[in-house]
Amino acid sequence: MSPELFFAALLLVPYVDCLTTALNDQLPLTPGEYEVFGNPKKYKEYFEYIRSYAPYNNLHKTNYPPMLVTSSIFDNRVLYSEPTKYIAKLRDLKTDNNVQLMKCKLEAAGHGGASGRDNAIKELAEEYSFLLKNAQIKK
């Protein structure tokens, strides 16, 4: 993973704590994912493999670009705790002054974001604004 390659990042309801999710077979989507990713509770090689690429498990002390990370309290695909836990660890480890924003949607919004055209446009405007502010475009 090479965070230095990016001037900014949008992580929109990201699946960043793959290993913890895969270890919890009480979550409704986890058992079905064993066919795709393997069962890390049952097989050590799947545990090690998932840990090798899981974003949460691969954070380390370094500079990270400015980030806008989103989640939704009503998302049943990526629990809001995953991005929240990720951003907390990232803030603890980062070695720069770049902003790491966390936005958790508390209104009815699922994995795909806000419903309704106006709300979707507002979200898109916030995301573009974040990227443009951090693009460091010179006049």
Model-derived regions, located:
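Active-site-proximal cap/loop segments of hydrolase catalytic domains
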Residues: 1-139
